[in-house]
Amino acid sequence: MKKRLSLVFAALMALSMIAGCGASNSKDAAKDTSAAPATSAQTSADAAAGTVSTDGSTSMEKVIGALGESFMQNNKGVTFTYNPTGSGSGITAVSEGRCDIGLSSRSLKDEEKKSGLKETTLALDGIAIIVNPQNKVEDLDIETIGKISTGEIKNWKEVGGDDAEIVLIGREAGSGTRDGFESITKTEDKCKYGQELTSTGDVITTVSQNPNAIGYASLAAVKDNVKALSVGKVKPTEETVKDGSYVVQRPFVLVTKEGKALSDTAQKFFDYVTSADASQIISDAGAVPVK
């Protein structure tokens, strides 16, 4: 079941006005009722107040959540929301004007760009090939991963594991992670999935509970309850994703509408997350910043 994650932080500022007592002449009354000038802090808070709505990739949950939290802490009065619906749904949402910024864990397709959408790469993310911690297999190459995915290789003993049937766990159609995985392994529309799930978290949980399962998930989301395999003898890390030696990777993309201005608050958020100031937050969340 898709869940809705809403990160909401609001700072309410109390303003008081001092009304002067009545005076015997209009000159004194004017002095008593004159408004005090706004402080610089009040002006800054008012300028930042507003809402930023994002929608899309579940793989980007950790990264976008950390960025949204940081933005709200630095901009009192802002409401930030994130709806984890999947890359395809997020792209549709921004196209239809249902959110400010779409989130995709794949690049836009040519037809999506032609429809008036624009992509901005926020970060790079490895797609980890994950198995149950009990699995003896430690490394697979791309060709072997492809053969497992299409069902050409059906048993773990064929790749150095136990005598057990391989169960492929993947994402639903429209997922950016699935699109990236199938594109890299050249298995588009050929994968024999045992289960197709609607979120990165569901894939990780399912693999962690099945000793014969193999799946794929955002490296930023992988925890100790699953084992990430090396691919072609290269382990998935921030360094190997950044230098390109770990080949199973894809971009984290912000999607906006070409020619349509964002609200002041949404633009401020966009500028912040794509600046060098956000790099450490992105890195701490497990992705590789591009700045």
Task: List the model feature ranges, each with a label.
Residues 16-20:
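C-terminal motif of bacterial Sec signal peptides marking the signal peptidase cleavage site
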Residues 1-7:
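Positively charged n-region of N-terminal signal peptides that target proteins for export
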